[in-house]
Amino acid sequence: DTKVERVEKSFDMIHVCPPQVAPDFIRVSPLADAAGWVDVDQATLRHKSFTNIWSLGDVMNAPNAKTAAAARKQAPVVAENVVADIDGKSPVAQYDGYGSCPLTVERGRIVLAEFGYGGTLLPSFPKWLIDGTKPSHLAWLLKEKLLPPIYWKAMLRGKEWLAKPEKVTGA
């Protein structure tokens, strides 16, 4: 029942992304907000109505990029907050909206765009090493050679040292 529309545009480079939506079983559940996403506090990632539910990744309503880089930063926030909740404490970690998108501008050079809520730049590296606003060969090498083993051998096994969450700063 989806309306199909054909759009023709001329371009030099195009990046096409399918619409990002939560699955039907989430959209129709009491967990969802009016737009169909799991309705969480965007800092703690705790559900706004069901305090025993936490959410991360592509199904929750934080206005960030739905990327693996975002989920990588969200997972430790949820983990620390669930442990605090089990101990009867308030949430101790917060998510800053981090997302990352390596933008290929030519073979051998990318812009390693890293950003948080409101488009705030959140670089992982000093600007003199990798400037996230400019294409570089070093960023390409990072994406090509270093990030795959970090992803497969560390991140997916819960041993990724660069994903430490921020502490809650206040309400």
Residue ranges and their predicted role:
Residues 71-97, 102-103, 151:
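Internal hydrophobic alpha-helix adjacent to the cofactor/substrate pocket in enzyme cavities
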Residues 36-54, 105-126:
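FAD-binding beta-loop-beta segment adjacent to the flavin cofactor pocket
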